[in-house]
């Protein structure tokens, strides 16, 4: 759509996955330092007030990652990876006009880096986030390690998709320059403990995966941006889903969420483990809502990789 980007979208690179193509950014150095914009039109889900929130989240992450120093002799080959991201949706985004991502380098330390990113349209902030990057392997031997076990239903569903035994649903069918299909597919596996009389005990389970494989050139940063994009797919409908009502009629679009979960008015994400392989772009997820009321809902989401390891 004309006007959806500031610059003409580049040709599609066949060596990259559809997800990488969708999430491409362009640097706007002529406007100012650390300013980026979407290279392609972003998806507006049918019936939604604004564009897909996962696109804004993932492009903010990608923009911040562009300002993280690469390993070099000057920093002792340090690798910094995202470990915390606190987000707020301020206004509904418009897919028909470009987004400018303004990154501020708040702090560069030896073990942690801090960035803030504002996504702006027509001079107004539509989304803001604070991100913290942690130096890889900065913990000593005294650190402890634990995580939630992947639910059996999610594990079985993920095993089937890895073997190609289950078809998924197109989640993003928007005009993204990558055929008419979206960059990932997903499927709801069911609701664990759906027999419970208490909605807060019912837990929807799903799996998602990228179409194709993330390219070697995309690396860890592309995997993390892809995870951010996909993790928003089933999240917002959790409250209405556990109540067995239509999301469209539930009026629950202003959901707020605590740390290690996702989406809408406020959200926070703690990334525990990074994605390192093409297979890592296939993940299982489980959502749970401990409370809803006054037109709002509290939702928690957990994500596991194909090996059942907690990602966040």
Regions found by a protein language model. Give the residues of each.
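Terminal targeting signals and extreme-terminal segments of soluble enzymes
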Residues: 2-312
């Amino acid at each position: 759509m004309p006007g959806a980007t500031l610059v003409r979208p580049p040709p599609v690179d066949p060596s990259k996955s559809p997800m990488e193509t969708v999430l491409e950014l362009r640097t706007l150095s002529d406007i100012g330092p650390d300013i980026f914009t979407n290279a392609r039109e972003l998806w507006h889900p049918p019936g939604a007030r604004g564009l897909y929130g996962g696109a804004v989240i993932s492009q903010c992450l990608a923009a911040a990652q562009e300002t993280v120093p690469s390993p070099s002799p000057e920093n002792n080959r340090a690798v910094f990876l995202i470990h915390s991201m606190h987000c707020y949706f301020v206004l509904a985004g418009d897919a028909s006009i470009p987004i400018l991502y303004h990154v501020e380098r708040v702090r560069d330390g030896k073990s942690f880096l801090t960035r803030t990113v504002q996504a702006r349209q027509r001079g107004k902030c539509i989304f803001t986030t604070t991100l913290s990057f942690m130096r890889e392997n900065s913990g000593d031997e005294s650190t402890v390690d634990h995580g939630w076990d992947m639910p059996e239903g999610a594990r079985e569903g993920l095993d089937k998709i890895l073997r190609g035994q289950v078809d998924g649903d197109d989640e993003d069918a928007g005009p993204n320059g990558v055929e008419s299909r979206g960059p990932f597919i997903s499927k709801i596996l069911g609701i664990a403990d759906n027999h419970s009389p208490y909605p807060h005990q019912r837990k929807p389970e799903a799996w998602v995966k990228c179409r194709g494989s993330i390219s070697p050139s995309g690396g860890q940063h592309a995997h993390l941006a892809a995870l951010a994009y996909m993790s928003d797919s089933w999240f917002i409908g959790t409250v209405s889903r556990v109540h067995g009502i239509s999301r469209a009629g539930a009026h629950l679009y202003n959901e707020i969420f605590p740390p290690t979960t996702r989406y809408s008015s406020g959200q926070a994400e703690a990334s525990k483990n990074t994605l390192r392989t093409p297979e890592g772009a296939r993940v299982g997820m489980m959502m749970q809502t401990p409370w809803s009321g006054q037109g709002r809902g509290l939702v928690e989401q957990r994500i596991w990789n194909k090996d059942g390891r907690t990602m966040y």
